[in-house]
Amino acid sequence: MTANQTRADGAIIAAATGLALVLMLHHPTSLSTTHDDGQFLSDWSNGFVHAAMIGCLLALAIGLDGVKRQLDETRILTRTGALLLGAGLLALAGAALVNGFATGRLLASTSDPAVREAGGHTLWALNQSLDALGTVLVALGAATWSPGLWRRSFAGRVAAALGVVILGLALWHTTTDGGFGLQMAVAAMAAFALWSLAVAATMILARPDGEAE
């Protein structure tokens, strides 16, 4: 990989992460029971926001593919981490698809309260499951890449440490059956954003020859 390609991948990761953080403002930002309280982007289409979030996940996958090549894709840990990250991002995209499109289509397709309630509960459970699965898989992938990132640079060591922390938090929350509500979604997004930005910095500041420090 050339230095420009490496920096471009880092820039893609940083941009996708930043946009995803902005899109999270579509959700309530307080614990008030008022539905619209704190929804800075409440006037944005739910479908548009979730479609854009899926686009961010796709952009992250593209940028992280460059990280895989930078970390030496012949290594088993690199390949395993890439597979876990890809599967995790796919699960998160599925969760966004359910929340952004499937739920709305269900409500529009019937006026039967019983069908709406049963379908809503089913889709909510599916969304929660995909979110939890995606979070754990991404955390596993980030931690699996930690040894390779640690060898890169100071930014790489920060990313490596964050990867281990994210995995610990994800496993703790999963084993305690805390559910995947808004607070957990925001916390998971913030933790993954820090890791992504550290990885982006590792790529942008990488040596032209691609060798570790």
Describe each model-derived feature in a short phrase.
Residues 1-213:
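Hydrophobic, aromatic-enriched alpha-helical segments typical of multi-pass transmembrane helices
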